[in-house]
Amino acid sequence: MDRIIEKLDHGWWIVSHEQKLWLPRGELPYGEATNFDLVGQRALLIGEWEGEPVWLVLQHRRHDMGSVRQVIDQDVGLFQLAGRGVQLAEFYRSHKFCGYCGHPMYPSKTEWAMLCSHCRERYYPQIAPCIIVAIRRADSILLAQHTRHRNGVHTVLAGFVEVGETLEQAVAREVMEESGIKVKNLRYVTSQPWPFPQSLMTAFMAEYDSGEIVIDPKELLEAGWYRYDDLPLLPPPGTVARRLIEDTVAMCRAEYE
């Protein structure tokens, strides 16, 4: 699936190492390979964006290595491809040796996988399923400031799905653990790949059922009910969290205006 980059190759270049992304001038590099000193490197074709190929190069650059979060404000499709590249780069870096027998592994030529040269075990990139849920109570939405968001951003609740747990059970558990309330009328909305580090966000909307807000201080700085027309600082557009909030606001406007 990979090949040597030639002079005439062009497109979008995802140059990644250790979950970092090369962002010269703060942007994903686009153009001919010669412009970015990539000729002769090995590249993996991981997709297409606006008719142009998207290449993954497993390489560290001395300067301008940043987080994929820095391209979150770009088009959602391009952000997702950048996230795919970072996740694949980390997968290949962390699977050089077989976890069963310890022998070297090599990449598959037909799919995104690593194969053991000794016991023939096959490894695929792991994806961690997560839930994210917007909870509505009349004309208000539950928003929280997470301990990892020290910039004042308030968002909806989210968390990882545990082993042996359904998505619906994960929603109920995470909401109770983080906020102390119960929800009802759960409805699936959409999903979004989320490369922090290798998640798949499954998005839901729910209605408040019962309970008073009691936050988990290990997870949240604060949480509260916010009227739909008086909201705090929100996650950026293009994120599934923002989509859930905007959908909830639209429902409130339709009912209360």
From Swiss-Prot:
EC numbers: 3.6.1.-, 3.6.1.22
Family assignment from sequence similarity: Belongs to the Nudix hydrolase family. NudC subfamily.
Cofactor note: Divalent metal cations. Mg(2+) or Mn(2+). Binds 1 zinc ion per subunit.
Recorded GO MF terms: magnesium ion binding; manganese ion binding; NAD+ diphosphatase activity; NADH pyrophosphatase activity; RNA NAD-cap (NMN-forming) hydrolase activity; zinc ion binding
Natural source organism: Citrobacter koseri (strain ATCC BAA-895 / CDC 4225-83 / SGSC4696)
Keywords (A to Z) from UniProt: Hydrolase, Magnesium, Manganese, Metal-binding, NAD, Zinc
Binding positions for a divalent metal cation 1 per the UniProt entry: A158, E178, E219
Statement: the UniProt record of this protein carries the keyword Cell membrane: no
Residues that bind Zn(2+): C98, C101, C116, C119
Record Gene3D superfamilies: 3.90.79.20, Nucleoside Triphosphate Pyrophosphohydrolase
Protein name listed in UniProt: NAD-capped RNA hydrolase NudC
Class of the enzyme per the UniProt entry, highest EC level: hydrolase
Nudix hydrolase domain residues: 125-248
Gene expressing this chain: nudC
Annotated binding of a divalent metal cation 3, by residue: E174, E178, E219
Binding partners and assembly: Homodimer.
